A protein has these predicted regions:
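Short alpha-helix in the alpha/beta-hydrolase fold that links the catalytic acid
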Residues: 294, 308-318
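Short, surface-exposed "cap/lid" segments of acyl-processing enzymes
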Residues: 101-103, 108-141
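N-terminal cap/lid segment of alpha/beta-hydrolase-fold proteins
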Residues: 64-103
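Primarily recognizes the serine-hydrolase "nucleophile elbow" in alpha/beta-hydrolase
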Residues: 179-241
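Short beta-strand/loop motif that positions the catalytic acidic residue
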Residues: 292, 298-300, 304
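Accessory cap/linker subdomain of secreted extracellular hydrolases
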Residues: 123, 210, 219-291
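Catalytic active-site module of serine/aspartate enzymes centered on a nucleophile-bearing elbow/loop
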Residues: 338, 345-380
Length: 380
């Protein structure tokens, strides 16, 4: 059973408490099941959580770090905020507000992928991948265009309350984002009728879930979202990764594939005991996509080794079948699941850390695509 995080006197997670998250539980699982078999441990974990490399290995201090502050020359301010959920706990976040742009501003809420993540969607600061802060970059690009942006620490991460995010189902995560939307609608600086959502990976599935229920959502961006259940994603990842093993016979490859599929089935069989895992395995994004009526931009890297690139078109087609006439798909060449430029795309921790030695920024192509599209649908 996952351990509930300890709280400090003010009800915020202690920065010194290291809790057993989904990562530690799965690490123990793959060791027991011998799922590795020539596969790096980091890749095995990625088969289970599509953006696990972002996971924060330790809690951020309750006092927001200075790196959440904008550059002094930026044409926007950054305000530390607290968003109260319907369950009464507070989510810590940063609200960037443009300067010298007409008010009230259009606004966007950013939605993180799976696994415990801070508001920048960065990993542990001690880990080199911590230099990769995609949500800070997206917030900067949008606020420089006159769009307010709210990004929040996941529940139980950083300065946010709410217990362990690993125990939250996908619909429960959506409720946290809805709290952020309500918060924006109550800000005088924000136009309540011009609010959009941008989500990556699992966050890309949460955005449509909210938009299908809330007609006030003006537009959504889906980054590397899936079009099938978590079970299907896991099986695809295993097949994809096994096919890339070099120096083995077809017979040996089949044996490895069978062993890995058996391990995945065991992992899935335990889903009833872990709320997030159960919702991940069962949730079908296509059923939601059919009911999304607002404008949608779907982005996917053609080197994504976590979610098949074809899923971008599957989502778009389902939305169009449901009557949505404003769905745009853009496949970015040589972009991986992190939306970094990468001609290979295969996931290993070593590969990604080496990649980040050369680039830790989202591509200009991606940032321009997002900011232009959001501006045209919210600000123009």
């Amino acid at each position: 059973m996952l351990q509930e995080p300890k709280s400090s006197q003010n009800g915020v997670i202690s920065p010194f408490h290291r809790k057993r998250t989904v990562s530690s539980v799965m690490l123990k699982f793959v060791k027991k099941t011998n799922l590795l078999n020539g596969l790096s441990m980091s890749r095995v974990l990625s088969l289970f959580l599509t953006v696990s490399i972002f996971a924060g290995c330790s809690q951020l201090p309750c006092k927001p770090p200075s790196y959440y502050s904008p550059d002094p020359a930026a044409p926007y301010t950054a305000e530390e905020v607290r968003v109260v959920t319907k369950n009464g706990y507070q989510l810590a976040g940063t609200l960037t507000l443009p300067v010298n742009f007409p008010r009230p501003f259009p606004a966007v809420v950013l939605i993180t992928g799976s696994h415990p993540q801070n508001r920048d969607m960065a990993g542990s600061i001690k880990n080199p991948i911590g230099r990769y802060r995609p949500f800070r970059q997206i917030a900067d690009a949008l606020s420089c265009r006159g769009i307010a942006v709210l990004r929040m620490d996941d529940r139980g991460v950083g300065c946010s309350e709410g217990g362990d995010i690993a125990n939250a189902t996908i619909p429960e995560r959506a409720e946290d984002i809805k709290a952020g939307i309500r918060y924006l609608k109550n800000r005088n600086e924000v136009d309540a009728e011009r609010i959009g959502l941008i989500g990556i990976s699992e966050g890309g599935n949460i955005g449509p879930m909210i938009a299908s229920e809330d007609p006030t959502i003006r537009a959504i961006v889906i980054m590397a979202g899936s079009a099938s259940t978590g079970r299907d994603i896991l099986e695809w990842q295993v097949r994809y990764d096994t096919a890339l093993i070099e120096g083995v016979s077809d017979e040996e490859r089949s044996r490895i594939l069978k062993q890995r599929m058996t391990a995945v089935e065991k992992w899935i069989a335990e889903a009833d005991y872990m709320p997030w895992r159960k919702s991940f395995v069962e949730y079908n994004p296509l059923r939601i996509a059919h009911n999304v009526r607002c404008p949608v931009l779907i982005l996917h890297g053609d080197r994504d080794a976590h979610v098949p690139v074809e899923h971008a078109h599957l989502l778009a087609n389902e939305m169009r079948k449901g009557g949505n006439r404003d769905v745009t798909v853009k496949i970015l060449a040589d972009h991986n699941h992190l939306f970094l430029k990468d001609k290979d795309g295969r996931f290993t921790n070593k590969r990604y850390l080496k990649l980040l030695e050369h680039t830790n920024r989202l591509s200009d192509e991606l940032l321009t695509t997002i900011s232009d599209w959001i501006y045209s649908h919210l600000a123009s």
